[in-house]
Amino acid sequence: MFAFKRSSCYFQVSNKIVKNGQIRGYISVADRVHRVTMFKMPKAEDQQRFLEQCRKMAADNQRNGSPYILSMVAGPAEDGPRTEGYTFVNKTEFASMEDMKYYETECPAHGEVKKVLGEITIDGMMTVFFKPQATGGA
């Protein structure tokens, strides 16, 4: 979801990107609100059903007539000794705390996700959110 424009001898991040035919301003990863939810979802069929609803939410999310979730990734957790029973992870990124609050309380697409959660086996969940204080990577 990055847009680059060529400068004289290097590429730089553009402040505008086009997604699904709409021009949107670019918000750096460090300025976003990152929300991570982990689920203890033991049944593979429940994980698959939930994953399908996450895909639908990624496509259908709207606020004021435009998509507002900047990034959404979801999937089963890789098995390992530190998972503490968490089997599924969803990470969303928002431009502001207000967008995240809308997501949690008013978003119809997220409401459909919550309905599915009420119909499948969940043995526990944990949600955290933050604005990055350090970023990096290759």
From Swiss-Prot:
Q: What sequence ranges are listed for the domain Stress-response A/B barrel?
A: 33-130
**UniProt-listed SUPFAM superfamilies:** Dimeric alpha+beta barrel
In Pfam terms, one family for this protein is: Dabb
Protein name in UniProt: Fusaristatin A biosynthesis cluster protein FGSG_08206
Instruction: Read off the InterPro entries from this record.
Output: Dabb, Dimeric_a/b-barrel
Q: In which pathway does it act?
A: Secondary metabolite biosynthesis
What's the stated role of this polypeptide? Part of the gene cluster that mediates the biosynthesis of the lipopeptide fusaristatin A. Fusaristatin A consists of a polyketide chain linked to three amino acid residues glutamine (Gln), dehydroalanine (dehydro-Ala), and beta-aminoisobutyric acid. The biosynthesis starts with formation of a linear polyketide chain by the highly reducing polyketide synthase PKS6. The gene cluster does not contain an acyl-CoA ligase or an acyl-transferase, and it is therefore predicted that the polyketide is transferred directly to the nonribosomal peptide synthetase NRPS7.
Q: What is the lineage of its organism?
A: Eukaryota, Fungi, Dikarya, Ascomycota, Pezizomycotina
